[in-house]
Swiss-Prot record:
GO terms, biological process: DNA recombination; double-strand break repair
Function summary: Involved in DNA repair and RecF pathway recombination.
Name of this chain's protein: DNA repair protein RecO
Upper classification of the organism: Bacteria, Pseudomonadati, Pseudomonadota, Gammaproteobacteria, Pseudomonadales
PANTHER family reported in the protein's UniProt record: DNA REPAIR PROTEIN RECO (PTHR33991:SF1)
Keyword Methyltransferase: no
Pfam families: RecO_C, RecO_N
GO cellular component: bacterial nucleoid
Amino acid sequence: MKGAVQQEPAYVVHRRPWRETALLVDLFTLNHGRMSVVARGANSTKSPLKAQLQPFQPLLVDWTGKSELKTLVQLEVRSAPAVSQPRALYSGFYINELVQRVLPVADPSPALFASYIETLQALADLSSQDDVEPLLRRFERAFAASLGYDFAWDETTDTGMSVQAGELYGYDPGQGIVSNLAPELPLRQLPGEALLALAAGDFISEAPRKTAKRVMRVLVDYLLQGRPLHSRSLFSHSNPSSGRES
């Protein structure tokens, strides 16, 4: 069968009704990146596919087709811990929306796929007291790196110099951390101590946590190019006093 793919590890990142009884499903896959498939009959009441094609559920999928839009042939549901805690669900919807809206079609990134699975596993283990922000920041970082926007927290790209405690720095999404504090930069006044803490892996302490949130917000918005993320509103609606998580 031409264009056939079998037993491909995949997750549903978005789905919607298509024509009379089908679903149009966006998948994030290990070896093919983001792919769109038509699941024929999946939107009918008698089809088991509708219950199986759920977000956060690991799948093995078969599809066929030579065009960009493939046809789902078969799928196998794999076991995994459920993502059920409300903030974990909202966070999962957020990373799914990032993948669905920004990742190019048919551009595989095994490293990002591994980060995606790791993030879902951590979200499944999240308790009501756990902090979700470090998980989101790490995924955002891996997501940006997969698109060519990686950077070092502790080195300036405009001078190649190491970040110093006690100094202030800027951030440009097209470059990374910079020593230049030009007015046109989207972020300035980033404390060197916080950047060094982030380079050491500290996403929990107050100053690096806030700095990472500011930087990754600017970077994600840059990658979105004006496209909205509906999942962001879930955080503010669930806890208006806490501010935006993502």
